[in-house]
Amino acid sequence: IVAVIDKKNTRSQNTAKNLGMTIEKEIPYKGHDCYLYSIQLD
């Protein structure tokens, strides 16, 4: 599962972290600087 979250959106970043997601890399997305979060489900 992946999520693209704007760097300025700390609430969504905290939610992703609480779900166990980690930052994979920084990416530009639709003109915004974002983080790509992911989690591996087994």
Where on the chain are the PLM-derived regions?
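Acyl-donor (CoA/ACP) binding surface of acyl/acetyltransferases
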Residues: I1-D42
